[in-house]
C-alpha cells in the first residue's frame, strides 16, 4: 500500500473483494496493518506468532478457539486472539471484518 492523502472508503474496498477470505490492506499505522476481509463459511484452523484483532464491520461471525468456547461477534464488536491460540473464523452468512495485526502476519498462520 502506498502513502495517500485521501480517505479510504471501507464500503468501496469491500465491494472489490473477490470472495470469501480474500483480504485487502486498508492502512498502516505504527507497527500494525489494517486489513478488511469477507468471512463466509469456515476458514481452516491456524495460529499466529502475533496477536490478531478482529473487528466485525457487518454481519455476524464466530471465532472458534481451540479448547475454549467460541466468541460470536456482531457489527461493532471486537476480539483479540492472543498469539499462539489456534482459531478459525466461521460465518453462516457473509460478514466483513477489519483485521488489525502485524504486517508479517500471514493469512493461514504458522
Label every model-predicted segment.
Residues 1-35:
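A short, N-terminal "cap"/entry segment at the start of jelly-roll beta-barrel domains
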Residues 25, 37, 44-48, 64-65, ...:
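Short histidine-centered beta-strand/loop micro-motifs
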Residues 30, 57-58, 74-75, 93, ...:
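A cytosolic small-molecule/anion-sensing beta-strand core signal
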Residues 31-33, 40-43:
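Intrinsically disordered, low-complexity, positively charged segments
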Residues 32-33, 61, 69, 85:
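Short acidic/polar mixed-charge low-complexity motifs
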Residues 38-39, 47-64, 100:
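Short, conserved beta-strand element in jelly-roll/cupin
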Residues 67-83:
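Short acidic-glycine-tyrosine-enriched beta hairpin
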Residues 83-110:
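Ligand-binding loop in jelly-roll beta-barrel domains
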